[in-house]
């Protein structure tokens, strides 16, 4: 049987995600971000709600990406997620992308010339942002051009790099309907960005979300809910460079900007430079919010939920893969657990995220 991996955020889960799961074959394993997203923001609804949405709509097994994999630039995000899925035995990786290319050929190219390609990136001037450097590399070695508004294509290239040299086939699926950041409401498939923006529009949600009731019952948060906490962390920390990935230049800019910024958005605008993209700045602010430190990634994989088919697969992995199904009895990842506690501060109604929580079981799919 084919075992298909999907790397996702489901922030929130929508019809485009359901379409992706429908296109996947065999047993479907999702490696999903926890409560903080790749581009440096809190998830609109918590990880358990999103895992349940996925399981109700075609996923067989949902596991959690640790905080220091979830909140990373595309390459590290892709690498960390593929590592986890590889250990769970996937033989193909399905992903949505704005432009379907021969990603397999790109992965093979990276297998062959990876060292040379990374050397090329290292030698580029530091005035360029990391995404600009990566794009120059792909242009140079694979003749790829970027239109700018294609974050899924950028992630797809990160996945191609991550599967290089592994026995995993890449299956790109053409992204349906609205673009990643689109807030357009007149499309067949709305983007997660649009759903977050129109979260109070009942008709809109019902048109584009398969698990509306779950979404509506869940506590919802946005970055601004954490702004007072972020501000406190910045003002009370005498040395921000002790925080993961915060260098002297960024520490100075953030300390200066917090004096006048009235919102997270304003803070991001003030700190962003040509070299430091908004996504990178948001990630740094997320690290500051949760006081992230450089840490080894957990050996074990945290299971958020499964169907009967997923349970059987987990059973077959016993003894080969270290799995955690209940945090408390077994510790998992201190960094992620701390991030979850801080996520809960966004709204008093957010449920406990770890202790005593057991995987969601969906009997039928």
From Swiss-Prot:
<keyword id="KW-0820">tRNA-binding</keyword>
<dbReference type="GO" id="GO:0005737">
    <property type="term" value="C:cytoplasm"/>
</dbReference>
<keyword id="KW-0436">Ligase</keyword>
<feature type="binding site">
    <location>
        <position position="152"/>
    </location>
    <ligand>
        <name>ATP</name>
    </ligand>
</feature>
<dbReference type="InterPro" id="IPR008513">
    <property type="entry name" value="tRNA(Met)_cyd_acetate_ligase"/>
</dbReference>
<protein>
    <recommendedName>
        <fullName>tRNA(Met) cytidine acetate ligase</fullName>
        <ecNumber>6.3.4.-</ecNumber>
    </recommendedName>
</protein>
<keyword id="KW-0067">ATP-binding</keyword>
<comment type="similarity">
    <text>Belongs to the TmcAL family.</text>
</comment>
<feature type="binding site">
    <location>
        <begin position="7"/>
        <end position="20"/>
    </location>
    <ligand>
        <name>ATP</name>
    </ligand>
</feature>
<dbReference type="Pfam" id="PF05636">
    <property type="entry name" value="HIGH_NTase1"/>
</dbReference>
<dbReference type="InterPro" id="IPR014729">
    <property type="entry name" value="Rossmann-like_a/b/a_fold"/>
</dbReference>
<dbReference type="GO" id="GO:0005524">
    <property type="term" value="F:ATP binding"/>
</dbReference>
<dbReference type="GO" id="GO:0016879">
    <property type="term" value="F:ligase activity, forming carbon-nitrogen bonds"/>
</dbReference>
<feature type="binding site">
    <location>
        <position position="96"/>
    </location>
    <ligand>
        <name>ATP</name>
    </ligand>
</feature>
<comment type="function">
    <text>Catalyzes the formation of N(4)-acetylcytidine (ac(4)C) at the wobble position of elongator tRNA(Met), using acetate and ATP as substrates. First activates an acetate ion to form acetyladenylate (Ac-AMP) and then transfers the acetyl group to tRNA to form ac(4)C34.</text>
</comment>
<dbReference type="GO" id="GO:0006400">
    <property type="term" value="P:tRNA modification"/>
</dbReference>
<keyword id="KW-0819">tRNA processing</keyword>
<dbReference type="GO" id="GO:0000049">
    <property type="term" value="F:tRNA binding"/>
</dbReference>
<keyword id="KW-0694">RNA-binding</keyword>
<keyword id="KW-0547">Nucleotide-binding</keyword>
<feature type="binding site">
    <location>
        <position position="175"/>
    </location>
    <ligand>
        <name>ATP</name>
    </ligand>
</feature>
<keyword id="KW-0963">Cytoplasm</keyword>
């Amino acid at each position: 049987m084919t075992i298909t991996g999907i790397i996702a955020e489901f922030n929130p889960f929508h019809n485009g995600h359901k379409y992706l799961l429908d296109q996947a074959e065999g047993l479907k394993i999702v490696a999903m971000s926890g409560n903080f997203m790749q581009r440096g923001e809190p998830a609109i609804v918590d990880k358990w709600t999103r895992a349940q949405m996925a399981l109700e709509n075609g996923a067989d097994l949902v596991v959690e990406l640790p905080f220091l994999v979830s909140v990373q630039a595309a390459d590290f995000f892709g690498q960390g997620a593929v590592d986890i899925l590889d250990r769970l035995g996937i033989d193909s990786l399905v992903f949505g992308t704005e432009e379907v290319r021969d990603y397999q050929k790109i992965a093979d190219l990276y297998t062959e010339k990876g060292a040379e390609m990374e050397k090329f990136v290292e030698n580029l001037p530091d005035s360029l942002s990391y995404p600009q450097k990566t794009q120059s590399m792909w242009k140079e070695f694979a003749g790829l051009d970027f239109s700018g508004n294609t974050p899924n294509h950028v992630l797809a290239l990160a996945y191609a790099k991550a599967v290089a040299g592994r026995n995993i086939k890449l299956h790109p699926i053409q992204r349906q309907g609205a673009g990643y950041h689109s807030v357009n409401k007149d499309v067949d498939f709305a983007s997660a960005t649009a759903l977050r923006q129109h979260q109070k529009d009942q008709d809109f949600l019902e048109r584009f979300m398969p698990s509306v009731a779950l979404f509506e019952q869940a506590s919802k948060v946005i970055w601004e809910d954490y702004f007072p906490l972020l501000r406190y962390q910045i003002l009370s920390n005498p040395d921000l460079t002790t925080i993961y990935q915060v260098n002297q230049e960024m520490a100075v800019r953030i300390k200066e900007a917090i004096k006048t910024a009235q919102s997270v958005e304003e803070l991001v605008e003030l700190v962003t430079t040509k070299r430091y993209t908004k996504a990178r700045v948001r990630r740094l602010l997320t690290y500051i919010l949760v006081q992230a430190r450089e840490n080894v990634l957990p050996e074990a994989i945290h299971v958020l939920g499964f169907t009967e088919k997923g349970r059987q697969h987990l059973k077959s992995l016993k003894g080969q893969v270290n799995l955690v199904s209940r945090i408390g009895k077994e510790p998992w990842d201190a960094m992620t657990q701390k991030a979850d506690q801080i996520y809960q501060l966004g709204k008093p109604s957010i449920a406990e995220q770890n202790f005593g929580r057991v995987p969601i079981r969906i009997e039928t799919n």
